[in-house]
């Protein structure tokens, strides 16, 4: 094996070999239990980020673990067409490169442009997924707009429509005036903002007066531009100030519309003036009030968010109405909505109807992609009746057919599902699944899989002109069918029979409503088992937290703190990293701040660490459901782990290759260390399997690290040296056999988390073991063998380790060179301790670097010594001739003085009010941590001074 571990040399060729050999495919053995994971499809034109790397590491670990247990495994891969996101990217691209809009192209040519863009950049993310070592079946790769999935989408739409679970209606939606499309509640980002509350007088009609004799009501609003669309004023029916006015009218300022005063509990007596203007076409709460009181709906805005030239007036059913005039005052027509706000406030003020303006803290809805203020807008949209679909989906989680890990996410799921609103599924975009609905010239709607089917089913001749609905479906509509459409539905395929329901879904909690809930609803409605019982899409939902930067900040391009997982695998120079973080920024003014932070954090760029180190780090940080702060030091630590495993394997191979390791017979004697490591290994297997079975990848990674680094490398390899240098033939055979057996088992154990290094080493080790199989990934996963857990060997070895560590600690405390042989005295020994010393004298002499071991009588004071107490014995190391008392005390005094200087410096900092007020919380915490560390170090040095003074 190469002297040093270079992941760059082994990872890509190895992955290509795996893929070429077809190792990632299901084994096709239907007698075996199947295990299937559906990858959450990333955006087809996107690139891999840390969230992907994190979730995919977890999924690949599970898939490799189950594959090694002989299960028929499928990790289904695919990408998402990502409607709004992809359309925006291509629109920006043609604007920047050609100065054109999508309208210059026209629908068909623009869609062709997107397909072209997908062909050019769609492979980036799948190439990156290969670099992570993902063992997905690439031959089954799907795309949410491939022919099969498009057919599944049409099938679902048509069936739901025929079951009256999809309908078209004029309702209020979140409208993004920049993207000119409806967006879902989940795509709205509510931001806190400082605004104003305008108090406007609405004159009472017909000579009516308030209880205190006023001839007007004062209405408070944060959106005065919507006054033009008011169709009522609500007061609380219990409000003594206004209840006698219910049923009377006010005259709406500026448009002189006569609108009713209604009694509704939506009006809060304690809030504002107690009078609320009702604009059903431009506010979600007002829409509900309007429905309750049959108030007409007046739309005053265009799809761009400008004031219309004439309003649209509808009744509560959404049908056109002439109950009110559609006239809008000429001075407000065509004004942009926020310009209209100023103009309307000025006009109201000029009429003497502006009572006051108060500062007001408010929550403003923004579109998370378009980045502009969202308008509630009355539009024709397609909806899914969600309550019908939600009922069985709630029951599936209640009765345990689907389990959330961690369990607390069930509450989040229930709270949303039990109060579910109808789902608006239409989007005013061009890229996506076009809605399979057609209209004739009379406005009749026909739904079918194709236009031909529509004509046939409805007996429409060629003379009837039909035009297809212009809208496309919400991206999440096709994603909701992901678990079954990818397996060939609506056909009853073998894949669907073998792999559905799938086993585990790995997802971030941020898309629990967008995706998880909708998959459960859609799957249970369309997929039934042979008894007609609805099938769940998956049995377990494993929720992950978000990956944040080292300060706990969300990673984002605008903060310049994004870390590309492949930069940690391959490394990146500082200039390249700076260009990546500051090039093409939406907010170029942030570039300098980002540059400074990056230079401080990565002065030499990022070193290459290899895929396995990245995967190990991600697994180790995967504590269920909690957000994760990324830690470069952990990554370095796991790269060191890979180096340690490599070097340990080289040691094993150097001592076993072309040697008699007992695989072809011959007597074998196992040393205490051999019996101990076999026991340790089996206990590790048991705990590790339990952790993986319970989705505790962090615990599994910790168990693997502890056994490999501490037990196998640091202890066992050292404990083999006495046998290797002076053992009999049968002892040598036993130790070599154990070395190879444990290493081979360890490689299989570690393979799901760190596949590349384990496969590479295993290819050498398998030869010694006489294994002829081609790849580690199809080898059986290690199983716990209770017969190999030798309790006596465990107890004896732990005692020897205690003794060796005690001697090493005395060396360190007394500053004695590691290679200097020492005399060891033992006093007050139990019979067990004496037996252990006598049975394992050569181990102790070798590993503790001792020249002699003497057991003293219990009452023997012995010479002046440093002592340590261990189980059943007191250890003494005589100090005569080992240290110069005066020199050692002088050295310790110097150390104490140095530490006291550091303590004074930090205490000074922390007592400086200016520093404490300005410094971030994390910096202060770090300084306090340092202070505690120095205080502890000082206490230890003072303890040592006391011991040496007493010598």
Swiss-Prot record:
SUPFAM superfamilies: Anticodon-binding domain of a subclass of class I aminoacyl-tRNA synthetases, Nucleotidylyl transferase, tRNA-binding arm, ValRS/IleRS/LeuRS editing domain
UniProt-listed InterPro entries: aa-tRNA-synth_I_CS, aa-tRNA-synth_Ia, Anticodon_Ia_Val, M/V/L/I-tRNA-synth_anticd-bd, Rossmann-like_a/b/a_fold, tRNA-bd_arm, tRNAsynth_Ia_anticodon-bd, Val-tRNA_synth_C_sf
Keyword annotations from UniProtKB, A to Z: Aminoacyl-tRNA synthetase, ATP-binding, Coiled coil, Cytoplasm, Ligase, Nucleotide-binding, Protein biosynthesis
Gene Ontology MF terms: aminoacyl-tRNA deacylase activity; ATP binding; valine-tRNA ligase activity
Spans traversing the lipid bilayer: none
One matching Pfam family: Val_tRNA-synt_C
Keyword Cytoplasm applies: yes
Residues the record lists as binding ATP: 557
PROSITE patterns: AA_TRNA_LIGASE_I
Short motif 'HIGH' region, span: 42-52
Subcellular locations according to the entry: Cytoplasm
Entry comment, domain topic: ValRS has two distinct active sites: one for aminoacylation and one for editing. The misactivated threonine is translocated from the active site to the editing site.
Function: Catalyzes the attachment of valine to tRNA(Val). As ValRS can inadvertently accommodate and process structurally similar amino acids such as threonine, to avoid such errors, it has a 'posttransfer' editing activity that hydrolyzes mischarged Thr-tRNA(Val) in a tRNA-dependent manner.
Official protein name in the record: Valine--tRNA ligase
Organism: Salmonella typhi
């Amino acid at each position: 094996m190469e002297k040093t571990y270079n992941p760059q040399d082994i990872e890509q060729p190895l992955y290509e070999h795996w893929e070429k050999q077809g190792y990632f495919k299901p084994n096709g053995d239907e007698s075996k239990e199947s295990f299937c994971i559906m990858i959450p499809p990333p955006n087809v034109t996107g690139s891999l980020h840390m969230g992907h790397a994190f979730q995919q590491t977890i999924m690949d670990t599970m898939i490799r673990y189950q594959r090694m247990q002989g299960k028929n495994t499928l990790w289904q891969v695919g990408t998402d067409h990502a409607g709004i996101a992809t359309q925006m990217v291509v629109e920006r691209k043609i604007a920047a490169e050609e100065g054109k809009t999508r309208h210059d192209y026209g629908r068909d040519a623009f869609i062709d442009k997107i397909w072209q863009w997908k062909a050019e950049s769609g492979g980036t993310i799948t190439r990156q997924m290969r670099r992570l070592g993902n063992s997905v079946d690439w031959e089954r790769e799907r795309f949410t707009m491939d022919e099969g999935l498009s057919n599944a989408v049409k099938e679902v739409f048509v069936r739901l429509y025929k079951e009256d679970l999809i309908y078209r209606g004029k309702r209020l939606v979140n409208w993004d005036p920049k993207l000119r499309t409806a967006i879902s509640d989940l795509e709205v980002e509510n931001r806190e903002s400082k605004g104003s509350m305008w108090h406007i007088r609405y004159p009472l009609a017909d000579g009516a007066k308030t209880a205190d004799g006023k001839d007007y009501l004062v209405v408070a609003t944060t959106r005065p531009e919507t006054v033009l669309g008011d169709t009522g004023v609500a007061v609380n029916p219990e409000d003594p100030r206004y209840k006698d006015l219910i049923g009377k009218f006010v005259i709406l300022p500026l448009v002189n519309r006569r609108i009713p005063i209604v009694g509704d509990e939506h009006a809060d007596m304690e809030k504002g003036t107690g009078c609320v203007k009702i604009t059903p076409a431009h506010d979600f709460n007002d829409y509900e009030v309007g429905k309750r009181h049959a108030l007409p709906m007046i739309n005053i805005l265009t799809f761009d968010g400008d004031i219309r030239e004439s309003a649209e007036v509808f009744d509560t059913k959404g049908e056109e109405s002439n109950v009110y005039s559609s006239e809008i005052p000429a001075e407000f027509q065509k004004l942009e909505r926020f310009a209209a706000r100023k103009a309307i406030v000025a006009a109201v003020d000029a009429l003497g109807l502006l009572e006051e303006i108060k500062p007001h803290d408010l929550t403003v809805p923004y579109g998370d992609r378009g980045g502009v203020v969202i308008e509630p807008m009355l539009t024709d949209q397609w909806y899914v009746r969600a309550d019908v679909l939600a009922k069985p989906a709630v029951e599936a989680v209640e009765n345990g057919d689907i389990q959330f890990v961690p369990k607390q996410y069930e509450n989040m799921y229930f709270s949303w599902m039990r109060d579910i609103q109808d789902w608006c599924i239409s989007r005013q975009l061009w890229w996506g699944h076009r809605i399979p609905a057609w209209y004739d010239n009379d406005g009749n709607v026909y739904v079918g899989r194709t236009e031909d089917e529509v004509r046939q089913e409805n007996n429409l001749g060629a003379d009837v002109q039909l035009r297809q609905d212009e809208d496309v479906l919400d991206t999440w509509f096709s994603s909701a069918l992901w678990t079954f459409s990818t397996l060939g539905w609506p056909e009853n395929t073998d894949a669907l029979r073998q792999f559905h329901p799938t086993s585990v879904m790995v997802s971030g909690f941020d898309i629990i409503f967008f995706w998880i809930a909708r998959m459960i609803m859609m799957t249970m409605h369309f997929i039934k088992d042979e008894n007609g019982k609805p099938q769940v899409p998956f049995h377990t939902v494993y929720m992950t937290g978000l990956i944040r930067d080292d300060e706990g900040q969300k990673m984002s391009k605008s903060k310049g703190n994004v870390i590309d997982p492949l930069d940690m695998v391959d490394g990146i120079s500082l200039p390249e990293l700076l260009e990546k973080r500051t090039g093409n920024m939406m907010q170029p003014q942030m570039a300098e701040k980002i540059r400074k932070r990056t230079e401080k954090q990565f002065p030499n760029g990022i070193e290459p660490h290899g895929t396995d180190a990245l995967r190990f780090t991600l697994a180790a940080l995967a504590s269920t459901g909690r957000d994760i702060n990324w830690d470069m030091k952990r990554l370095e630590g796991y790269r060191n782990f890979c180096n340690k495993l490599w070097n340990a394997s080289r040691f094993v191979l150097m001592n076993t290759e072309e040697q008699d390791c007992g695989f072809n017979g011959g007597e074998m004697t196992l040393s205490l260390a051999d019996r101990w490591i076999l026991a340790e290994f089996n206990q590790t297997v048991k705990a590790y399997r339990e952790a993986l079975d319970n989705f505790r990848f962090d615990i599994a990674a910790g168990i693997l690290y502890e056994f490999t680094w501490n037990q196998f490398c640091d202890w066992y390899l050292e404990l083999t040296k006495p046998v290797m240098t002076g053992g009999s033939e049968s002892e040598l055979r036993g130790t070599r056999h154990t070395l190879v057996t444990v290493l081979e088992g360890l490689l299989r154990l570690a393979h799901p988390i760190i596949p590349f290094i384990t496969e590479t080493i295993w290819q050498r080790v398998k030869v010694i073991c006489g294994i002829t199989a081609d790849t580690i990934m199809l080898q059986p996963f290690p199983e716990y063998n209770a017969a190999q857990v030798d309790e006596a060997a465990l107890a004896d070895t732990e005692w020897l380790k205690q003794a060796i560590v005690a001697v090493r600690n005395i060396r360190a405390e007394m500053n004695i060179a590691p290679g200097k042989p020492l005399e060891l005295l033992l006093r007050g020994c139990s019979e067990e301790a004496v037996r252990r010393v006598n049975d394992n004298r050569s181990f102790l002499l070798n590993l503790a670097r001792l020249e002699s071991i003497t057991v003293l009588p219990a009452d023997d004071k012995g010479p002046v010594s440093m002592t340590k107490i261990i189980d059943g014995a007191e250890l003494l190391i005589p100090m005569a001739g080992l240290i110069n008392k005066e020199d050692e005390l002088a050295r310790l005094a110097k150390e104490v003085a140095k530490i006291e200087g550091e303590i004074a410096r930090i205490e000074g900092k922390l007592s400086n009010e200016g520093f404490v007020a300005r410094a971030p919380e994390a910096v202060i915490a770090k300084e306090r941590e340092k202070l505690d560390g120095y205080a502890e170090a000082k206490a230890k040095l003072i303890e040592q001074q006391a011991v040496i003074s007493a010598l």
